[in-house]
């Protein structure tokens, strides 16, 4: 950590010091500059033509789904392709009805279907029904085990089946030891055979071993899957063309949204006013695309990205700049939630505090227009909670206090920010985000606790070395090592086991009967997926290296060639 000294004249209400020593994290600057500010709209006639093509192709796909009504395996393959290609949102009703029909006939009535003795077909059946939240039993895989309960050696020759079973295991819930065994079995053997496979199956296996589909971002996974799907002779040309056209139309919408946000962000001039903070509008928007990319959530994205940039800046004020006395003032101001508190703040904090109130006022006006003003209470309360958590961590850092792991997690799950972001993600979702939904969220059900855990544990595992070098508050890794007297490697192993359980809790929380409407549960799952992608190897939000840059470019710069 470096310490910089700042003239006291720029800070109000602190008169006893001539200079203030501040921790500076030296976060890398934004790599994007003004790239996304200007957006050239596509010719209206060309766009209209593409939209007509999309509608025609959608009708063709609907017909294909309908004609396969008595062919479950064919239906499953079409559904799988639409989901992997990122266009399932166009066919939600058709997919829902198809899977319901398959569930009733093949599971409830126990009717055999073509391929019901084939590992690939059974695993695909299981995965797609679990993805649609049906409580199908993993006992369907017993037929692939020998008399001693081990998976049969003959399966090792079926790479396609092993891959599908591997993908299915990531939808497991607590108590499904058979799927735990299946994960170990498939992972081990796929790693052994991948170098002997041909393209495109070899590429599919490599990708899945790195990024299981269930934990990936659907739109990002679609970009990868386009070329894989196209390489198979059996691919559906209508599906592929529809997916590429739709991808480009959505990309245009997202670029337009980002351009609007970039102009707003530049007008705030936070990069100049808060040079110590991470300037990550583009990365933040990428994060939000992982939460929802569909066109009907345009307003929701505009709301959450503005709040996201505010909380990211506030996080860095507490984490990498503010003194304890200054942070106490900011915490009190947030608790009061009153523009009159502005005069009590240090000069450099004022633009941030005012912008927070401005953003919330703008959202409040929108909620009022929708007759949903009650939502603002929850949004404000979550902001107050997370800022209180930042304050607790700042005190620990100032006192060089290393809490117990349990004490740490009681605060760190809040500062992970995922209940906060889930709350904000609901604001622009329309009538489905009822008062009951917000009350349910505030009760911290197991699925939200699990999501918070994934966020916090992955953040700590990937960023604790950088943070300790700069004098950050003790991370969960350090707290765990100190309390239990274990090595860093052992702490990582314990965290990994906690992550496995948390994902099982999330999977369980998504199963029918739904505690809340499915779109609300999907925001929790989607936010958790973002963490798995961005913190896969390291903190790519803070340190925007080539893998992260490439992911952003694939969604927001590079169109699909149709």
From Swiss-Prot:
Motif DDXXD motif, residue numbers: 315-319
Cofactor binding description: Binds 3 Mg(2+) or Mn(2+) ions per subunit.
Disulphide bond pairs: none
Enzyme's top EC category: lyase
UniProt record, GO biological process: diterpenoid biosynthetic process
Domain of life, per lineage: Eukaryota
Residues engaged in binding Mg(2+) 3: 467
Binding residues annotated for Mg(2+) 2, in chain numbering: 315, 319
GO terms assigned for molecular function: magnesium ion binding; terpene synthase activity
Binding of Mg(2+) 1, residues: 315, 319
Listed cofactors: Mg(2+); Mn(2+)
InterPro entries: Isoprenoid_synthase_dom_sf (IPR008949), Terpene_cyclase-like_1_C (IPR034741), Terpene_cyclase_plant_C1 (IPR044814), Terpene_synth_N (IPR001906), Terpene_synth_N_sf (IPR036965), Terpene_synthase-like (IPR050148), Terpene_synthase_metal-bd (IPR005630), Terpenoid_cyclase/PrenylTrfase (IPR008930)
Enzyme Commission designation: 4.2.3.-
Gene3D superfamilies: Farnesyl Diphosphate Synthase (1.10.600.10), Terpene synthase, N-terminal domain (1.50.10.130)
Record-linked SUPFAM superfamilies: Terpenoid cyclases/Protein prenyltransferases, Terpenoid synthases
Keywords on record: Lyase, Magnesium, Manganese, Metal-binding
Protein family (similarity comment): Belongs to the terpene synthase family. Tpsa subfamily.
Protein's job: Sesquiterpene synthase.
Protein name: Probable sesquiterpene synthase
Organism this protein belongs to: Santalum spicatum (Australian sandalwood)
Gene (UniProt): SesquiTPS
